[in-house]
């Protein structure tokens, strides 16, 4: 009996050779150790043996099984090692070769300007508010003191989607929504984002452009607070040596309203002024529609075009360059903070 079992193990060893594949080895395992395998079938003989010989026979079978499994496992490991070495040869890396330089990306100039303003106002305690670009007429116009028959609506040639929805013409509806949500509590926010109007695209106009509006509402807010805020923002953006000039203007959502000019020195050393934004004290009607008592609360608001800032700050002469995705233009802003 022992010789028969040993011959089974020997027959397996005789079938092992270097040309076998992993599939061949699996087939051999099934042939010898499978449910109907050569060695497995020997187990049925144990029933015919005397009781005193059964333990010894069982031990022979187990030893043979371990031997067969070991032979197959060793050969599998050899094949796997060969395959791994072949793969490593294909993936050999010459560490003496110079490395490849990855092209550095850059932030879009409008992103740079937006992040700069956000960082500045967050440092002053403001929150950054967001809102939908597809807006309801109620928030875009009505809550900004622009009733359906208000003549100032003619100033907005808008992209209407339905009778009551449009692509927002300014980021003021973000303010309206925030006021409504705040339920009469003090707020200080900025609202940057894309806006849309039916302007023909040229060097100074675009049907899509970006704004950043600011809104502060609290008790005892004065025009002096607005002026100091505008001065601080102008100096942060354009330099500490700048000053501002306020000119009376008109906006339906503020009263009084002003246009804000920022000083600069021309090539002849002469101080000149350039208009950069509009601002004013929040109109009482806007406060009321937003859920605030104008006898208790006052506020100020301002709005500035982000393309306007980028054009002045980076000396860009055509607003269309912001939206053409021309890498020759965008690559100029690598490393700009």
Curated annotation (Swiss-Prot):
Alphabetical keyword list: Aminoacyl-tRNA synthetase, ATP-binding, Cytoplasm, Ligase, Magnesium, Metal-binding, Nucleotide-binding, Protein biosynthesis
Gene3D superfamilies to which the protein is assigned, alphabetical: Bira Bifunctional Protein, Domain 2 (3.30.930.10)
CC cofactor note: Binds 2 magnesium ions per tetramer.
Annotated GO MF terms: ATP binding; magnesium ion binding; phenylalanine-tRNA ligase activity; tRNA binding
Predominant cellular place of this UniProt entry's protein: cytoplasm
Pfam families with a match to the protein in the record: Phe_tRNA-synt_N, tRNA-synt_2d
GO cellular component labels: cytoplasm
Cofactor(s) the protein needs: Mg(2+)
Compartment list: Cytoplasm
CDD domains assigned to the protein according to its UniProt record, in alphabetical order: PheRS_alpha_core (cd00496)
EC code(s) of this entry: 6.1.1.20
Taxonomic superkingdom: Bacteria
GO term, biological process aspect, one: phenylalanyl-tRNA aminoacylation
Binding locations of Mg(2+): 255
Protein's UniProt keywords contain Nucleotide-binding: yes
Reaction catalyzed: tRNA(Phe) + L-phenylalanine + ATP = L-phenylalanyl-tRNA(Phe) + AMP + diphosphate + H(+)
InterPro entries according to UniProt: aa-tRNA-synth_II, aa-tRNA-synth_II/BPL/LPL, Phe-tRNA-synth_IIc_asu, Phe-tRNA_ligase_II_N, Phe_tRNA_ligase_alpha1_bac, Phenylalanyl-tRNA_Synthase, tRNA-bd_arm
Quaternary structure and partners: Tetramer of two alpha and two beta subunits.
Similarity annotation: Belongs to the class-II aminoacyl-tRNA synthetase family. Phe-tRNA synthetase alpha subunit type 1 subfamily.
Protein name as annotated: Phenylalanine--tRNA ligase alpha subunit
């Amino acid at each position: 009996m022992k010789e028969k079992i040993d011959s089974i193990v020997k027959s397996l060893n005789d079938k092992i050779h270097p040309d076998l594949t992993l599939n061949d080895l699996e087939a051999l395992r099934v042939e010898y150790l499978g449910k109907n395998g050569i060695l497995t079938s020997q187990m049925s003989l144990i029933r015919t043996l005397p009781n005193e010989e059964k333990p010894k026979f069982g031990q022979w079978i187990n030893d043979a099984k371990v031997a067969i499994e070991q032979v197959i496992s060793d050969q599998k490991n050899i094949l796997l090692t060969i395959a791994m070495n072949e793969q490593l040869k294909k993936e050999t890396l010459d560490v003496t070769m110079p490395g490849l330089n990855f092209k550095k990306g850059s932030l879009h100039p409008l992103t740079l300007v937006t992040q700069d303003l956000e960082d500045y106002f967050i440092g002053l305690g403001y929150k950054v508010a967001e809102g939908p670009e597809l807006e309801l007429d109620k928030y875009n116009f009505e809550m900004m003191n622009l009733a359906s028959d208000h003549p100032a609506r003619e100033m907005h040639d808008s992209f209407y989607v339905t009778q009551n929805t449009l692509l927002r013409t300014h980021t003021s509806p973000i303010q309206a929504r925030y006021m409504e949500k705040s339920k009469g509590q003090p707020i200080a926010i900025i609202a940057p984002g894309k806006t849309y109007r039916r302007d023909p695209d040229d060097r100074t106009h675009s049907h899509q452009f970006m704004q950043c509006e600011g809104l502060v509402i609290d008790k005892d807010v004065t025009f002096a607070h607005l002026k100091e805020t505008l001065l601080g923002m102008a100096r942060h953006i354009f330099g500490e040596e700048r000053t501002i000039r306020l000119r009376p203007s008109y906006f339906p959502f503020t009263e009084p309203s002003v246009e804000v000019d920022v000083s600069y020195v021309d090539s002849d050393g002469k101080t000149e002024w350039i208009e950069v934004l509009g601002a004013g004290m929040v109109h009482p009607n806007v406060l009321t529609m937003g859920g605030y008592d104008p006898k208790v609360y006052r506020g100020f608001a301002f709005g500035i075009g982000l393309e306007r800032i980028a054009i002045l700050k980076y000396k860009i002469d055509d607003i269309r360059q912001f939206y053409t995705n021309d890498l020759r233009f965008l690559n100029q802003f690598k490393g700009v903070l």
